[in-house]
């Protein structure tokens, strides 16, 4: 009953090694990020010559923990770390929804992938940038309490 589906899944994730076909086998990988946080600035739309426009905004995620002994764990000091993420939205439908409805302070859920790139700054110095490229889903819970889900 489950034999065929199990074999299909197994074949997708296991790389078959052989001398003849080893260069022909493509193995699957996964690059997926899910973030839930607050928008740090209103989105901006940018367009580079010859390329499609992109909507860009920053997103803050927080990590909180208590310090102290395990016996009095609830009595310890609360610490918090905020991490800022650069979100880029390239998909035409989702890009426009993000530009129109995402505002500073809104609570956002973003699903996408991590991208590492390089660029030259205005002083001609090579810089590295980490960007989250929004995929198919962007859920906006605005400051006013309204919710909007954008799917592309």
Swiss-Prot record:
Q: Which GO terms describe its biological process?
A: DNA replication; mitochondrion organization; positive regulation of mitochondrial DNA replication; protein homotetramerization
Domain of life according to the entry? Eukaryota
Q: Which InterPro entries match?
A: NA-bd_OB-fold, Primosome_PriB/ssb, ssDNA-bd
What Pfam families would the database entry show? SSB
Q: Where is the SSB domain?
A: 30-141
Q: Which residues carry this modification: Phosphoserine?
A: 67, 79
Q: In which tissues is it expressed?
A: Expressed in all the layers of the retina (at protein level).
The subunit field of the Swiss-Prot or TrEMBL record says:
Homotetramer. Interacts with MPG/AAG, through inhibition of its glycosylase activity it potentially prevents formation of DNA breaks in ssDNA, ensuring that base removal primarily occurs in dsDNA. Interacts with POLDIP2. Interacts with PRIMPOL.
The protein's name: Single-stranded DNA-binding protein, mitochondrial
Organism in which the protein naturally occurs: Mus musculus
């Amino acid at each position: 009953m489950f034999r065929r589906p199990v074999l299909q899944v197994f074949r997708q994730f296991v790389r078959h090694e052989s001398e003849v076909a080893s260069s022909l086998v493509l193995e699957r990988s996964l690059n997926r990020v899910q973030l839930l946080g607050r928008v740090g600035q209103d989105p901006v739309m940018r367009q580079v010559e010859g390329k499609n426009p992109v909507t860009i905004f920053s997103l803050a995620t927080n990590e909180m923990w208590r310090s102290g002994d395990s016996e009095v764990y609830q009595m310890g000091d609360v610490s918090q770390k905020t991490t800022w993420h650069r979100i880029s939205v390239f998909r035409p439908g989702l890009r426009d929804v993000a530009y129109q409805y995402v505002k500073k302070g809104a609570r956002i859920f973003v699903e996408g992938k991590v991208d590492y790139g390089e660029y030259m700054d205005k002083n001609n110095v090579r810089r590295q940038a980490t960007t989250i490229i929004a995929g198919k889903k962007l859920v906006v819970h605005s400051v006013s309490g309204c919710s909007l889900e954008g799917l592309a």
